[in-house]
């Protein structure tokens, strides 16, 4: 194990080695903020340099002052499993949360980042979209301060208000636009806990449908464009304003150099193949874009799981970095645990109560501490390989090579020369594909349930693979679905898919 001396002492661990618990008296623990967006496409951050219409100056400033990862991944191409993986630091397929419709019992048995950091004396809080069970249960997952407004417009489940005052946990009327409320809640939490280390999860429901930007933000994007695109740009502008407010609050409280910030999305944009500009802002394309990545939400192609990723820690992570080695959202928990001086794998109570030993669970993390890599101390790649399983799909990335399996189909891509996954090299390099599949099968044998896939490919995903990976024209909708779609339009919104792709 190596130690690094900064302005205050932090003890890290070389990736893969166990982290020993460190006395709080010997460790100045940094604050940690995780900012998560919802259904954000690869192209929709100004710092990515892809789309000229997106304007995110505050997020771009984080990229300029810190690190932008060009191969930053999430654990699933759908909201619930991706969030379960991020917050637990373990592949959600290990505990049976494979997709949005699955039971959450497996997640309920995990230690979240918040539970772990409470053991190290951290204040913990969250705001925004939870999507991992009823809002009233969030406190049982280690988050003491909650302002959750993922449900009905103008409503929130909260136990503190936007002035930072403690209230009885209950459904309340939220006084402002939900994205503005998230930003205000984050700032209130920072001020409330400025004198102790804290962990805050800022989970904006943007640009996920329903598309509901206020006029304040819509007016920033005049001119002809698809209305769903305008809504996406406006909602992301609200997020960006909020990030600016959070940074201002950190500076005003003298905490900027003591705070590590992660920013990413939960999965790629749902393009619905055709990017239809359906009226009403309901289920369908959210206006976001994945270009030049191939595919979309609901696929283990790059367009479904490679996300904009920023990491900022002033004075610790060198500014202006473009980091090319693959990293994954699982690494957030491992990094946080390392910085808090905790062990990355042990038997511990799920709810952080040391007296409640009957609720202990196996808690070994799947990620690695990224700080030695992001500071430049460790020049190697953080991971030998990254692995995914999502329902009927599985994938492995090892270096530049990626093997993608969807039902009976297999694809091999060289992401170094073909990040857009346009050229299937399976026939040219069968030996590489066989080796990667063997590694993938070994990993998948540890999952719950074991195996490369859980169920057959649904029709929706077959159509997505046909279009994005096999170059076939999209199939015309059947008469029943077309009728439902027309009916949905008549009500001012697109019809939802029956397989949960819109969730």
Regions found by a protein language model. Give the residues of each.
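Formylglycine-dependent sulfatase
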Residues: 2, 6-10, 21-410, 417-438, ...
